[in-house]
Amino acid sequence: MSLAPHGGTLVNRVDESYDVSGIQKEIELDLISFADLELIGIGAYSPIEGFFNEKDYVSVVENMRLSSGVVWSLPITLPVDAQKAAELSLGETVKLTYEGETYGVIQIEDLYVPDKQKEAVNVYKTDEQEHPGVKKLFSRGNTYVGGPITLIKKASKQFPEFTFEPSETRRQFAEKGWETIVGFQTRNPVHRAHEYIQKTALETVDGLFLNPLVGETKSDDIPADVRMESYQVLLDHYYPKDRVFLGVFLAAMRYAGPREAIFHALVRKNYGCTHFIVGRDHAGVGDYYGTYEAQELFDTFKPEELGITPLKFEHSFFCKKCGNMGTAKTCPHGREHHVILSGTKVRGMLRDGVLPPAEFSRKEVVEVLIKGMKKKEEVGVS
């Protein structure tokens, strides 16, 4: 059986029969809070039951713990602008809308102005506007609304056949007889380095939960539909069907490096994972974080506080002399023999019309990516 959810209980804040006809006020969500609303509602963010009040916000920003003491690394907030904040009052129940449709309600228990400078430095380790997470933070409203939510409608899904709630993945893992499940988070197509890490992990557990993020990402990331097709073709040709489960993760990417790695692990724990792969520069961007800083952050918590086991991997590469994949732990040869693989490199090659070599990526995956990049250019998406 899967481990207990984070905090002990899988949160369920869904009530699709909730009557909002008497509620006049509303808050229009952006893409981040729209995704967060559903993820809170279905229990992916257990034990969180709503957008953070000031007490939880300050505690997480400063100590990576909720005010209850439970480990949580990223603030889950609902920002509004000053004009909207002036309309709201404590104790009110307000509709949460996206593109004019109501998806939930929030019972307002807190309205507060955050110290965004401190949030940026603590969460992202920088206040530079060039950092996509910091840029997004400062572009959002300057008042945060806190309180428990009720999810009354789920968004229509881009990938319905690969969209699962934590209660569903837990049931599926149990039906497969998996007792140990390793989660893998990615926003890139799976290249050979990822494949090597996943299969190495799979040697030690019952199942692999490949859980690509399909929420908001940077504009130069490969589109989600292209990535999903690349995952499917890879799994069909190179993975044992009865040992892998593919499902999407709806959250937006924060690019918060080490803190986001902890967040990714805790969420996968709620989906039923017992282990989580933490590679090099997990959830990083540019040169803001050390190569293995995310792995080191896991070591600052007691294992029972996290309740999910990190599987830490060094950067893997293809060694021409060995003739296969390896890491510094398994390969004795110098860097001149290594083909260093990365999602950034693969993206750059594809953009330049260069075919990545077989050591980089499987042929079937490359074909899907090239087709997808061409389509992206044709429709003029930047």
From Swiss-Prot:
<comment type="similarity">
    <text>Belongs to the sulfate adenylyltransferase family.</text>
</comment>
<dbReference type="InterPro" id="IPR024951">
    <property type="entry name" value="Sulfurylase_cat_dom"/>
</dbReference>
<dbReference type="InterPro" id="IPR020792">
    <property type="entry name" value="SO4_adenylyltransferase_pro"/>
</dbReference>
<keyword id="KW-0808">Transferase</keyword>
<dbReference type="InterPro" id="IPR014729">
    <property type="entry name" value="Rossmann-like_a/b/a_fold"/>
</dbReference>
<protein>
    <recommendedName>
        <fullName>Sulfate adenylyltransferase</fullName>
        <ecNumber>2.7.7.4</ecNumber>
    </recommendedName>
</protein>
<dbReference type="GO" id="GO:0070814">
    <property type="term" value="P:hydrogen sulfide biosynthetic process"/>
</dbReference>
<keyword id="KW-0067">ATP-binding</keyword>
<dbReference type="Pfam" id="PF14306">
    <property type="entry name" value="PUA_2"/>
</dbReference>
<dbReference type="GO" id="GO:0005524">
    <property type="term" value="F:ATP binding"/>
</dbReference>
<dbReference type="GO" id="GO:0004781">
    <property type="term" value="F:sulfate adenylyltransferase (ATP) activity"/>
</dbReference>
<dbReference type="InterPro" id="IPR025980">
    <property type="entry name" value="ATP-Sase_PUA-like_dom"/>
</dbReference>
<keyword id="KW-0548">Nucleotidyltransferase</keyword>
<dbReference type="Pfam" id="PF01747">
    <property type="entry name" value="ATP-sulfurylase"/>
</dbReference>
<dbReference type="GO" id="GO:0000103">
    <property type="term" value="P:sulfate assimilation"/>
</dbReference>
<dbReference type="InterPro" id="IPR002650">
    <property type="entry name" value="Sulphate_adenylyltransferase"/>
</dbReference>
<dbReference type="InterPro" id="IPR015947">
    <property type="entry name" value="PUA-like_sf"/>
</dbReference>
<keyword id="KW-0547">Nucleotide-binding</keyword>
<comment type="pathway">
    <text>Sulfur metabolism; hydrogen sulfide biosynthesis; sulfite from sulfate: step 1/3.</text>
</comment>
